[in-house]
């Protein structure tokens, strides 16, 4: 197996590959936690390539640069901060000041502004719309995700965005069903197991 295919295989098993969630939520979920503590899956340019491939963003053969890695991480952190604001997330470390929120808004908007637009050109004396010019496919993909994040956080679905309060979880999700309370089945099972354990301890204490 080549190193690129090995990376893609590893990516497919990571916590942020949540096919039912919108891309901004999947980007936020590149920060996740387990029994070993928090993990960051966007540490290198290759990580950005793997993530874009896994979520279906076409890189057109381009590879993320160090600047695009910085942009991806900054966008991810900004969207997480704004999600915490929208959901009134009171998990440890999630709270943010008004200045932080303003800076996060600037980051999302600046990233989205990189979307390529058709260019007006003069051909044979006539004005025509030419093909879009602009950044690399990686930057364009991140700009599209930033645009989707703005729509999610500021649109009708913002009211369905939730923080997952399962023990140790740091993820967010869009509540697609009235009874859904957790980001995943695994988190739901962990909560139920914790409740069962606590009830058993309470019964022992009453005996």
Placement of each model-derived feature along the sequence:
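Short helix-coil boundary/hinge micro-motifs
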Residues: 1-163, 170-172, 206-207
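Alpha-helical elements of the RecA-like P-loop NTPase motor core of helicases
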Residues: 26, 191-194
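Cys/His-rich microdomains that often coordinate metals
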Residues: 168-173, 191
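Cysteine-rich micro-motifs
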Residues: 178-190
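Contiguous alpha-helical segments
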Residues: 195-207
